[in-house]
Curated annotation (Swiss-Prot):
GO molecular function term, any single one: 3'-5'-RNA exonuclease activity
GO biological process: mRNA catabolic process; RNA processing
Predominant cellular place of this UniProt entry's protein: cytoplasm
KH domain span: 550-609
Gene3D superfamilies, per database record: GHMP Kinase, N-terminal domain, K Homology domain, type 1, Nucleic acid-binding proteins
Protein name: Polyribonucleotide nucleotidyltransferase
SUPFAM superfamilies: Eukaryotic type KH-domain (KH-domain type I) (SSF54791), Nucleic acid-binding proteins (SSF50249), Polynucleotide phosphorylase/guanosine pentaphosphate synthase (PNPase/GPSI), domain 3 (SSF46915), Ribonuclease PH domain 2-like (SSF55666), Ribosomal protein S5 domain 2-like (SSF54211)
Record EC number: 2.7.7.8
Compartments, as annotated in UniProt: Cytoplasm
Biological function: Involved in mRNA degradation. Catalyzes the phosphorolysis of single-stranded polyribonucleotides processively in the 3'- to 5'-direction.
Residue span(s) of domain S1 motif: 626-688
Highest taxon listed in the record's lineage: Bacteria
Binding site for Mg(2+): 484, 490
């Protein structure tokens, strides 16, 4: 294959254009070291009639890319893994704001990882491969985009670190954008400590990222512009509104429109605007319902922006920096290890905490790791339809739910002191009017504390928004659902009083300037201080019920005794677990026994196991080498027979000893035998 080589931002990327998958609108083979990704873009020639951007992004990992066969019973890639879904979202969120507002051609971007050497960054590589493929497709006047990752090791920022360096970093900052501005950010702190990053340092990291993106995007445009397809879709002038209808709305229905804007709940607001549209349609048949709805949307959006930018007042009458009222309740669910109900305005999150053992950890297979990894801290976010007043069934977790859960997990992960502890937090969104993921962070942090988990500090989250008109703009703290829908930016920021532990930024514009982002960071810090003050007050009222919380008892036995605790076919350990209602983890090489459950049951289980092993030792002590016994055949196995001994316990008569004497045994037979050895707590027998 012929490759085009581009050197920028500490990496050498290679692109083979239009040599594979040639029936796609555009395709390329991307190579970085030993990592190879096939990127393709396919576009349907007929636009859809619905009012949405029909863009689909699929990032797919192939097990063979790392020389592996898929684990599990079915040896074929199946349902998408979380990493694949999150990476698909990452790329989708980068490109979506760059498309023209009235682009309606079904478009699919597919990225297949064909080879991966573990050291190279799959997400940066996939986004860059997708960016060039989309640029070559030339389906719309879309700017060149690129991505970079910033790490921080020993107070020094590093652009595009490899996996080994990232594992040493206290910062994981992923940024994508054009050469002029940023349009997507994902950040989390890393390490054993909280490692919250202060706002001035965050700005410095973002400036470094912007410089990297500018360099890469400029090179992409210079190198790949000659290879672009013919432009498929030219941006139109947009919707042409009927001025008479707009005047009608402003003069006769303006008060009703304001009432709809000021309605807090999404369902209530939709009902108000539906009634307005229905009323106008009945009174003025010369206007179509679609035309009325478009015009209503325009008047609504214009008025919301005017209120915020000119009057400095928001639809719910809050000031720009004002956070909605907060109410926190704890210990609502008596059988869970913790439960926190966090209500902020009309957004309500119930976070439930449960502690577990190593067996409860989620195991993942990944191209990024040679062996399956254990996820010990899990955060699951659920967004049932009733939380926004919708009547529909609850199904499997959506991409959005996975993304919000992942964001909350990233925000809280470094606040946990003991990284070996297995913890599951579940956020049930009971009511939503914006910022539900950040409500989940606040409730989740308190739920960790209420579960008896040692944390470095409480972590709070707030969603920031922005509304702009020309050069004028306003930044909003703790945005509502309406402000999120009608605004230009959704900037979620979580952290403590010292700095930021996680953030996520999406925009509906082609990008956001750094000075606006920095202002949002500083404004978010003030909001965070306010929220943390309320959270600390709530924390003081939480009474941790240690008697109800599971406790863990760890002790060691001789490694060869572990098989005795397990028993034949797991019989003994199953009986212990069922009898005492505990969880047990056993480590054969070290002899470590870990018991988890109710404190009283755990102590009784430990006592039972030690007494059981002691009784086995006593049984062995009753016998001596060369002692002749009258034993009874208990059970026949492939390798011999287990015999019940007269003074208790059992011994093994191996098959070769039986064959040597040409003896055929049945269960229940009595036989004379001789003790020949003691091996790892077992009695070996021979025929006497």
């Amino acid at each position: 294959m012929d490759f085009i080589t581009i050197n920028s931002s500490n990496k050498t990327e290679e692109f083979a254009l239009k040599q594979v998958a040639k029936q796609a609108t555009s395709s390329l083979m991307y190579r970085l070291g030993k990592t190879i990704i096939l990127a393709s873009v396919c576009v349907e020639r007929e636009p859809v009639s619905e009012d949405f951007l029909p863009l689909v992004v699929q990032f797919l990992e192939k097990s063979y890319a790392a020389g592996k066969i898929p684990g599990g019973f079915v040896k074929r890639e199946g349902r998408a893994q979380d990493f694949e879904i999150l990476t698909s979202r990452l790329i989708d969120r980068t490109f979506r704001p760059l498309f023209p507002k009235d682009y309606r051609y079904p478009t699919q971007i597919t990225l297949m990882v064909l080879s991966h050497d573990i050291e190279n960054d799959l997400q940066v590589s996939a986004l860059n491969a997708a960016s060039v493929a989309l640029f070559l497709a030339h389906i719309a006047p879309i700017k060149s985009v690129s991505a970079c990752r910033i790490a921080r090791i020993d107070d020094e920022f590093i652009i595009n670190p490899n996996t080994s360096l990232l594992n040493q970093s206290s910062l994981d900052l992923f940024v994508s954008g054009t050469k002029e501005s940023l349009n997507m950010i994902e950040m989390r702190s890393l390490g054993q400590k909280l490692n919250a990053l202060e706002e001035p340092l965050m700005l410095k990291a973002l400036e470094l990222a912007q410089k990297s993106l500018k360099e890469t995007c400029t090179l992409y445009e210079e190198v790949f512009t000659p290879h672009q397809n013919e432009l498929l879709f030219k941006e139109s002038q947009g919707i042409i509104f009927n001025e008479r209808l707009l005047d009608l709305l402003k003069n006769q229905y303006f008060d009703e429109i304001i009432k709809g804007i000021e309605s807090s709940a999404l369902s209530e607001r939709e009902n108000v605007f539906h009634e307005i549209a229905k009323k106008i349609s009945e009174a003025h048949s010369e206007f179509s319902l679609e035309e009325i709805e478009w015009s209503l949307e325009k008047v609504k959006k214009t008025e919301i922006r005017r209120m915020i930018i000119q009057d400095k007042i928001r639809p719910d009458k809050r000031a720009l920096e004002e956070v909605r009222p907060i109410l926190i309740e704890s210990d609502l669910l008596p059988m869970a290890h913790s439960s926190i109900l966090f209500t902020r305005g009309q957004t309500q999150s119930l976070v439930v905490g449960v502690l577990g053992t190593d067996n409860d950890a989620q195991t993942h297979e990944s191209l990024e790791h040679k062996t399956p990894i254990k996820e010990r801290f899990m955060f699951h976010y659920n967004f049932p339809p009733f939380c926004v007043g919708e009547a529909s069934s609850i199904g499997a977790a959506s991409r959005r739910e996975l993304g919000h859960g992942n964001l909350a997990k990233r925000a809280l992960e470094t606040s946990i002191k003991n990284k070996e502890q297995v913890i599951r937090l579940v956020s049930e969104i009971l009511e939503s009017n914006g910022s539900s993921s950040m409500a989940s962070v606040c409730a989740g942090s308190l739920a960790l504390y209420a579960s008896g988990v040692e944390i470095h500090d409480l972590v709070a989250g707030v969603a920031m928004g922005m509304v702009s008109e020309g050069q004028d703009y306003a930044i909003l703290s703790d945005i509502s659902g309406l402000e999120d829908a009608e605004g230009d930016m959704d900037f979620k920021i979580a952290g403590n009083l010292e700095g930021i532990t996680a953030m996520q930024m999406d925009t509906k514009m082609s990008g956001i300037q750094l000075e606006i982002l920095y202002q949002a960071l500083l404004q978010a810090k003030e909001a965070r201080k306010h929220i943390l003050k309320i959270m600390h007050e709530a924390k003081e009222k939480i009474v941790i019920n240690f008697s109800h919380l599971p406790t863990t008892e760890i002790f060691n036995v001789a490694p060869d005794k572990i098989v005795e605790i397990i028993g034949q076919g797991g019989r003994v350990i199953k009986e212990i677990v069922e009898k005492f209602e505990v969880k047990i983890d056993l480590n054969k090489p070290s002899g470590e026994v870990k018991i988890m459950g109710n404190k009283e049951r755990v102590l009784k289980t430990k006592e039972f196991i030690l007494n059981y092993l002691h009784s086995l030792d006593q049984e062995l002590e009753q016998y001596t080498i060369d002692e002749v016994l009258e034993a009874q055949v208990k059970r026949i196995v492939d390798f011999g027979a287990f015999l019940s001994l007269p003074k208790g316990g059992e011994g093994l008569l191996r098959k070769q000893n039986m064959d040597r004497c040409q003896v055929v045994l049945r269960e229940g037979d009595s036989i004379r035998c001789r003790v020949i050895s003691f091996n790892k707590g077992k009695i070996a027998l021979d025929l006497a």
